[in-house]
Curated annotation (Swiss-Prot):
Keyword Ion transport: no
Name of the protein this chain belongs to: Cell division topological specificity factor
Family, similarity comment: Belongs to the MinE family.
Cited NCBIfam families: minE, PRK00296.1
HAMAP family found in the cross-reference section: MinE
Pfam families attached to this UniProt entry: MinE (PF03776)
InterPro entries: MinE, MinE_sf
SUPFAM superfamilies in the record: Cell division protein MinE topological specificity domain
A Gene Ontology BP annotation from the UniProt entry: cell division
Gene: minE
Annotated organism of origin: Shewanella baltica (strain OS155 / ATCC BAA-1091)
Keyword set, alphabetical order: Cell cycle, Cell division
UniProt KW Cell division keyword: yes
Amino acid sequence: MSLLDYFKSKKKPSTAVMAKERLQIIVAHQRGQRDTPDYFPQMKQEIIAVIRKYVQISDDQVSVQLDQNDANLSVLELNVTLPDR
């Protein structure tokens, strides 16, 4: 195998492989959201409303996630991208 063959052999992954990877990411994301409580969407909107009292932000600047590690532990993660002053 020559040095040129080594560089030529690298090919882009097929579209089927890329589609499969994307689908796996989407399914994993949806599985994570499946176990969220019923009150979670309303709680998220109320948190955004409180933040808007002090800072002008849009919905896409706020990320709220609920991670349930086990039956006794839940973690509410809130990420807010604040505008520049």
